[in-house]
């Protein structure tokens, strides 16, 4: 049986979707899955240089073995292709959530948005101009992955007696050199997944629900929220908020001098974001910071509602055209009103059904886990 070892370093929430999938495959006896403390990675072939590297943020380290080979895998769930980790040299396979074919196949800069000027992307251009020549000989290891999955955490109460038993079991397993137990985490993930499935049954109540921040080319986001205000004034049911965040050198927002008194930009009220999003005719999302997907975007795909987004620069391992979404580069977001007027309740339900089928085919946790296992062993 194929064995998968995950060497844990907290926090790794961005890769919980894969983690849940591996737990499910193990429960079905498709694989043997184990979790270990990070320092155990050297017993399975990883370099001890990783342990002294510093920040391992958004990186996970796995070994997949089939009885003959031990394949060292890094799962990179950073927002962008620009943040390829130099630790790739210590991996056999490198799964990259921020995959972009221009970067990793053509070894060139990505095709930026038409509304982005040279100053908007200068920081990334400079970074990539160094990383591509430095690591292009490692690009053969890079494989497409998925962006951040929906949040899988929730609070599940545990009795004092059970917690005591778990603590004893944990100490015993440590003393015997056994892998870490993850039973409680698996229960949390399963419970949360059931909650997510219920969101698919929400009825249409709103036109657009969007909770947003200025992080990531704020002028573009401001234009979106200005358009949402116009739509609200025309009678569309809009609930949205744009909060101001600290400016960044990455997207040149540090030079904009945005007035805090103009924020937050708010329309209506958002009480339960996930439920209201699931009840909205359209999910609309600007590109994430560093062009990455946000987990709320992936949640919208899971729920199945129609989605309008900036053209996607990050490429998952499946064809995004399997989903009914609209990609745009219109900085004035004029597409919104057209879609709101054209999509009927029948269309909405049909699109949801098709998108849910696509999600379950390409993005269900077990499917993602099988993809990682199979691609690792190719």
Regions found by a protein language model. Give the residues of each.
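Catalytic binding pocket for nucleotide-activated donors in carbohydrate/polymer assembly enzymes
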Residues: 259-262, 270-377
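Nucleotide-sugar donor-binding catalytic core of glycosyltransferases
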Residues: 2-63, 67-291, 310-320, 365
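Short, Lys/Arg-enriched, disordered terminal segments
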Residues: 1, 377-378
């Amino acid at each position: 049986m194929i064995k998968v070892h995950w060497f844990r370093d907290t926090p790794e929430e961005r890769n919980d979707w894969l983690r849940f999938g591996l737990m499910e495959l193990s429960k079905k006896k498709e694989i043997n899955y184990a979790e270990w403390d990070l320092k155990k990675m050297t017993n399975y072939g990883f370099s001890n240089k990783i342990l002294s590297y510093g920040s391992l943020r958004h990186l996970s380290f796995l070994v997949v073995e089939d009885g003959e080979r031990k394949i060292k895998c890094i799962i990179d769930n950073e927002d962008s292709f620009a943040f390829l980790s130099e630790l790739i040299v210590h991996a056999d396979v490198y799964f990259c959530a921020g995959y972009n074919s221009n970067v990793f196949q053509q070894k060139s800069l990505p095709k930026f948005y038409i509304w982005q000027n040279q100053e908007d992307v200068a920081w990334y251009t400079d970074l990539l101009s160094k990383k591509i020549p430095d690591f292009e000989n490692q690009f053969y290891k890079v494989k497409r992955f998925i962006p951040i999955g929906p949040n899988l955490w929730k609070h599940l109460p545990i009795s004092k007696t059970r917690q005591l038993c778990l603590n004893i079991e944990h100490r015993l397993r440590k003393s015997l050199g056994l892998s870490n137990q993850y039973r409680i985490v698996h229960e949390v993930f399963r419970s949360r997944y059931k909650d997510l499935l219920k969101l698919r049954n929400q009825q249409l109540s709103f036109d657009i629900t969007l909770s947003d921040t200025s992080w990531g080319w704020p002028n573009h986001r401001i234009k979106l929220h200005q358009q949402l205000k116009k739509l609200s004034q025309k009678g569309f049911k809009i609930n949205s908020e744009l909060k101001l965040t600290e400016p960044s050198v990455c997207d040149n927002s540090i030079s904009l001098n945005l007035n805090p008194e103009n924020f937050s930009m708010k329309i209506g009220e958002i009480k339960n974001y996930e439920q209201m999003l699931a009840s909205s005719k359209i999910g609309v999302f600007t590109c994430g910071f560093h062009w990455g997907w946000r987990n709320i975007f992936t949640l919208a795909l899971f729920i199945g509602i129609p989605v309008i987004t900036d053209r996607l620069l990050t490429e998952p391992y499946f064809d995004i055209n399997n989903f009914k979404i609209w990609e745009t580069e219109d900085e004035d977001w004029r597409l919104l009103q057209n879609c709101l007027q054209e999509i009927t309740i029948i269309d909405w339900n049909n699109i949801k059904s098709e998108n849910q089928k696509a999600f379950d085919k390409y993005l269900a946790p077990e499917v993602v886990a099988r993809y990682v296992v199979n691609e690792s062993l190719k």
